[in-house]
Amino acid sequence: MLEQIRRPADLQHLSQQQLRDLAAEIRELLVHKVAATGGHLGPNLGVVELTLALHRVFDSPHDPIIFDTGHQAYVHKMLTGRCQDFDSLRKKAGLSGYPSRAESEHDWVESSHASTALSYADGLAKAFELAGNRNRHVVAVVGDGALTGGMCWEALNNIAATPRPVVIVVNDNGRSYAPTIGGVADHLATLRLQPAYERLLEKGRDALHSLPLIGQIAYRFMHSVKAGIKDSLSPQLLFTDLGLKYVGPVDGHDEHAVEVALRKARGFGGPVIVHVVTRKGMGYPPAEADQAEQMHTCGVMDPTTGQPTKIAAPDWTAIFSDALIGYAMKRRDIVAITAAMPGPTGLTAFGQCFPDRLFDVGIAEQHAMTSAAGLAMGRMHPVVAIYSTFLNRAFDQIMMDVALHKLPVTMVIDRAGITGSDGPSHNGMWDLSMLGIVPGMRVAAPRDAIRLREELGEALDVDDGPTAIRFPKGDVCEDIPALKRRSGVDVLAVPATGLAQDVLLVGVGVFASMALAVAKRLHNQGIGVTVIDPRWVLPVCDGVLELAHTHKLIVTLEDNGVNGGVGAAVSTALRQVEIDTPCRDVGLPQEFYDHASRSEVLADLGLTDQDVARRITGWVVAFGHCGSGDDAGQYGPRSSQTM
């Protein structure tokens, strides 16, 4: 049946039984397609009936449907003409794992960061009103814990102020990645209890109505008591007191009930909340049995069992998790903070060991950072574990609440650099540029597991300002021993015997291994290369400047945007001490990159050892000639320059 659904209008003629059959078919397809590519399975299994109802009630794209945390949009894609493309999900040139304006007119925003849909909806509704299109509804689907984000409440405050037709669907599955934390979650949980409570009152009413006059009096008394109790217990007042109408709670897996609620909401003509209760992972036993995350995300797996098809190697997150627990066993002042992602950031095990020292603040990165500042003021050493892409959301708090006060807060930045298959919204290529302008900030980029443990310990020993440690997604690189350590810098390779100190190659973090491969290629061409890992990459340490003075060309190699990254910092530092060795930066052009594997993105950007070696050879030739010993001349223009 799904093959016959090419556009939302094709749903209109289906019977309720056909809709139930279609929902089952969609779930089966979701499991098999996501099992083959990896992706967000649990959230999409939970919104099948809801998405069917949305497209039967509203006229997309005339009525925009905006998915907050856009990983809930797989079913939406299936119903808007993209079902046949799911074999390419999250692959290069294939279907995005999030809404994509390039894919379909039904996708209004490239949504993937949480708590933004209501603000988009508010703006669209205002635009439609100004254009005289008040018959257009805007639907925002908010779920997976997004209401724990403060931006949602800022938007609700504005949406409620005017009678524009905004329908806010709260997809309440009680979870983000893990169970949703906080007062809003508790309020919604109370609302979920109300249907049973209402049914009990209905039975009491029927019994009392069967009695003579005394029954009518008793019913009126009970109804007045009920109203008082409900007013005191109903968290729907959170919404109605703002001026928003409220419909629900509704069983999110009863398509007809959801459709009735949505039609009712559509008829109001103003802002309304539709509270839909769903189960993440619905209909797939392995997901339902996953108590921790209900298979929020999965890699390639066996669709029958839900088990991964290959044994995962130790990754960066696991190494960090183990190291942090080790340090915390020795120091009671170490605490950890996560913004609704204890599992993905490696803090679940920490919480099991130290339940009173892990704080899950919900999807609230700004609050997480300022709360960390408060903990540091109270003589704790907080570790904020966060994805690089989400660190952007807390920049003001890092600057004004942490750094201004010189507080010892350690930020552990996971998924730094190119992450790949999740696309432009999840690449962590901005953090070095952002943190580089924060006064007093010290940033480390470990090249391997040994250095991660080592640099985490060093960060935890800092008591006079903020620190950050960044590492990428995926398996840990092989350990790379240093030949020696000089002024805080690890020297990983030196020119072969007989070659001059032509190039100083600065490998940042995991790019140290690429730097060694590049050096080998250059050595084979007679170019002498020293490879170093600065370890603490920002601010630029004296060891880098000392070595820069003795080489003829400096090249930095980093998985960050070239604007404002380590290369730019090295160039600035050289100018400040009047070292005129030319500097070239190899990194990521400041652009948004479509989803593909990490290796595919890097190859497309020319960030392979072969391509980088070729570029450096060109610079060496342009600047002069290389040679051995004293006959090696100084290269060309005597200035620091970033490319």
Curated annotation (Swiss-Prot):
Co-factor binding comment: Binds 1 Mg(2+) ion per subunit.
Subunit-structure text: Homodimer.
SMART domains: Transket_pyr
Gene designation per UniProt: dxs
Any one of the GO BP annotations: 1-deoxy-D-xylulose 5-phosphate biosynthetic process
Species of provenance: Mycobacterium leprae (strain TN)
PROSITE patterns, per database record: TRANSKETOLASE_1, TRANSKETOLASE_2
Family from the record: Belongs to the transketolase family. DXPS subfamily.
Superkingdom of origin: Bacteria
EC number: 2.2.1.7
Binding site for thiamine diphosphate: H71, S112, H113, A114, G145, A146, N173, Y284, E365
Classification via CDD domains: TPP_DXS (cd02007), TPP_PYR_DXS_TK_like (cd07033)
Protein name: 1-deoxy-D-xylulose-5-phosphate synthase
Name of the top EC class for this enzyme: transferase
Catalytic activity: D-glyceraldehyde 3-phosphate + pyruvate + H(+) = 1-deoxy-D-xylulose 5-phosphate + CO2
Keyword Nucleotidyltransferase: no
Pathway it works in: Metabolic intermediate biosynthesis; 1-deoxy-D-xylulose 5-phosphate biosynthesis; 1-deoxy-D-xylulose 5-phosphate from D-glyceraldehyde 3-phosphate and pyruvate: step 1/1
Function: Catalyzes the acyloin condensation reaction between C atoms 2 and 3 of pyruvate and glyceraldehyde 3-phosphate to yield 1-deoxy-D-xylulose-5-phosphate (DXP).
Keywords: Isoprene biosynthesis, Magnesium, Metal-binding, Thiamine biosynthesis, Thiamine pyrophosphate, Transferase
